[in-house]
């Protein structure tokens, strides 16, 4: 039996008809507000639209009041290079020579726990389409991954699926994966974080925006067919009794995780680029979260009129789909374009060339309304702004948790520290052989890092570097970082430390940092303590970007990351984009470019171990105060590194972060397959020098012929620079080693074996 379609006319005539708005996540007052907006009860299709568009994920209703601070702290000077910012599909910045870069990071956390492979794969696909929608060619991806404890039973299932999903989708698209992070912590058990970043490049004049203007212009849906995947809770609308099976209009339970097809998306990318090149698109929007509900309402809301859509024209891949399901489907690999009538034939011809299904489903109107019909009957008639941009805004209670004082007071001062050479050596190997610091090659080798041929630096480097222009060598650098442990101790400082590290990681490649994006992963916004963490992190990130003089161009918020009442560590992920005028002068990570290089430590080392990897691995300790943040010092470091790169004064560079100086030394030695001898300055405490996680520090290798020039430049700029060793190939025929003079020596073979065997042993 076919369910009667709930039309606008029927809704007006049946004001008391019961509707499952609570099951769809709407609160009583939100439902009443919808009735007030419409002057009647919503139809099932309208209810589906409002429920998904007013969700936390789409509306930012709990975070919006705090996110405004980004705009308040962005100066006109910071906006000078920004071509598109917060509110667009992705941020876009001018990178010189007529080029622009667009980048964004988004979460796909919850789907990646339910179905790790498809959750992660479609996370990559979704962020790639955001970049496509700006008029850009996607050129690379990165990822920030968080899993439960490495030895927890479920971590293997989740990690295996997530890594295969990211690699399977990204590799099939032909996009290099040029970096990221993988972190294990018990707080992420049952709630992994899968944050995918994509970067694209375009000529400035090719920028596209998401708006529907020009009455009479056509709305064309193109890409994959629309199915039942990704609908989730909206399926309760398919039955008057909220029951039934999955085969017809009474189906109750539908898949909440989307299913991706990277080969369809690969063709869609090329199709879009040809459409852009032929100037056949007025406005464009990808179909991601909330599907057609989002695309139609956002295009209409951002445009200058309204929109009429004939929903029965939407190509389907499942029988008996209801209007609510069609509007809410999150089937992947779909785009929605606004096209002038004169260009429709040419648009369709390009789609046919690429074998991309394209359908004219409606047109732009001057009514100021979003009207959607189903076989001639109106099922949606709403003001589009009320769906897309004027949803509820909450000022949720914000309260610093009472437990925060005890957490901060519980410092590492009482922990036993290694002091002898043997103890320091054992500590190094303990940290290097832990899931916290071991090699990620088991994961990253499943990704293609060099496809497309424009990757200049990738995994093992602090930031990824890509060539943009073959003729001039102009390129971009990008890094993404986060520290849930530091953010738990001090959310304001933790967010700034993540920003500072991403900024520094871009700078050590020789590039100049120019823009910021973010993905803010937190627990429930209904918890005042979580909202305190969130609000502090936002302010820290915004103030930090202002201090560094680079704009936050966009971002994403992911709330409700918790299992039961246990929230994840607050994890603000920060991405920083940089520009390098010629990728030939990029600075690699590995030692050994030139024989006998001098190793110089830039920055100040302090006794800072609270929240450190050392405390975590050796004592399972989290407490105290995170390292000091000095953003003026970070800017100075970046200026020195850029100048050193331009003048050829530095042959390698590596930032200091987790694990401190000795971890950086080991990584740079392994990357360059060469040994080194560390000589600690007189009076320096060996443990503090080797393992402190003080921020604002970089280890550089300087050719012997340039040492005096480089140190003079640092001195002139007021940047501490201490000679701490030399690159040493080792005795002829002997095994290269890392030697800390007077304390210990470890061969590269032992370091490599210790580091590289951990993850294969756990997950191989």
UniProtKB/Swiss-Prot annotation:
Pathway, per record: Purine metabolism; IMP biosynthesis via de novo pathway; 5-amino-1-(5-phospho-D-ribosyl)imidazole from N(2)-formyl-N(1)-(5-phospho-D-ribosyl)glycinamide: step 1/2
Keywords: ATP-binding, Cytoplasm, Ligase, Magnesium, Metal-binding, Nucleotide-binding, Purine biosynthesis
GO cellular component: cytoplasm
Annotated spans, Disordered: 1-23
GO MF term set: ATP binding; magnesium ion binding; phosphoribosylformylglycinamidine synthase activity
InterPro entries in the cross-refs: PRibForGlyAmidine_synth_PurL, PurL_linker, PurM-like_C_dom, PurM-like_C_sf, PurM-like_N, PurM-like_N_sf
Binding-site positions, substrate: 107-110, 129, 258, 330-332, 558
Amino-acid positions noted as binding Mg(2+) 1 in the UniProt annotation, renumbered to this chain: 106, 556
Reaction(s) catalysed by this chain's protein: N(2)-formyl-N(1)-(5-phospho-beta-D-ribosyl)glycinamide + L-glutamine + ATP + H2O = 2-formamido-N(1)-(5-O-phospho-beta-D-ribosyl)acetamidine + L-glutamate + ADP + phosphate + H(+)
Tagged with keyword 4Fe-4S: no
Major site of localization recorded for this protein: cytoplasm
Binding of ATP, residues: 60, 104, 518, 555
Positions that bind Mg(2+) 2: 130, 286
Functional note: Part of the phosphoribosylformylglycinamidine synthase complex involved in the purines biosynthetic pathway. Catalyzes the ATP-dependent conversion of formylglycinamide ribonucleotide (FGAR) and glutamine to yield formylglycinamidine ribonucleotide (FGAM) and glutamate. The FGAM synthase complex is composed of three subunits. PurQ produces an ammonia molecule by converting glutamine to glutamate. PurL transfers the ammonia molecule to FGAR to form FGAM in an ATP-dependent manner.
Official protein name in the record: Phosphoribosylformylglycinamidine synthase subunit PurL
